[in-house]
Amino acid sequence: LMSKENAVKFAPVILAGGSGTRFWPRSRRARAKQVLALEGQRTMIQQTLARLQPAAQASEVWVITNSWLRDVIEQQLPEIPQSHVLAEPCARNTAPACALAAFLLERTEPDTVLGVFPSDHVVANTKRFTEVIAAGIKLAAAGDNIIVLGVKPTRPETGYGYIEQGELVEQDETPLGFKPITVHRVRRFREKPDAHTAERFVAAGNFVWNGGIFLWSARTLATAVREHVPDMAAPLEAIAAAYGTPEFDAVFAREYPKCENISVDYAVLERRSAKGEQRSNIYSLPADFGWNDLGSWASLHEHLGEDDKTNVMDGATTGLFA
């Protein structure tokens, strides 16, 4: 997203490393759900790239995946430079994946805003998505800010982490005439709750699901990693330094396993939020664009709706629930 006014560079990072076993038997390990056409004709990762296109050119997009999905992702997303499709040598959760992109870009373009987007999400209202992401980019570029997208709970779900929202700091009017984008300070991140706690969170009204979409500048995340997970910094620095050289694959394979296997939520967001609502510079924006994470057949079922025989039918998935 380059405009003459703010000239903010935006680089989306698509996370496509999951092994997709929750959609077994349709998504055996070699064909994880990201590369399946679970809804419509395009695969989930193709849909993810398409909805990012208004905000970023394909040449600016990065994909973090694994060795067995790399080839199929390169086939499905030929617009993305192959040098931007990075295959983790081992699974290390989301903190090293997010931080790797930040360390790579920090070397040359530290003010670039990175957006983290899981590849198994479905978004019904892409215009609203584009608008919320644009607001998030602007806020992430304005300083040492971390932006998280929160989903208003529709049920006391125990499968997601929750974000406890604090002070309402602004309501941006939007050019397309949708409802204003509300920006809250984040008070705390809460782990996946038990059923009783989830009911309490939903009743309280100021808790939203952590949808796993984040925005921050390369410098902000790299600096936060050095502060909160310092042992991760040296391996990632070494990998970033080797990027674009013949040694890259060897350095990646040697250094990446040294990174702790930890989510970015635990590694950075929870630790940073401990500084307090006014000092952590973490803000939540609403993921009010018809979000679903399709993490399992149950959420696909909810997303597609039911026919009168309570069988969910979709062109790409006909008969799977029959």
Residue ranges and their predicted role:
Residues 2-9, 218-322:
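Left-handed beta-helix
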Residues 65, 117, 193, 216, ...:
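A conserved hydrophobic position in a structured secondary element of the catalytic/binding core
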Residues 91-96, 155-157, 195-197, 291-292:
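A short acidic, often aromatic-flanked loop/helix-cap motif at beta-alpha or helix-coil junctions
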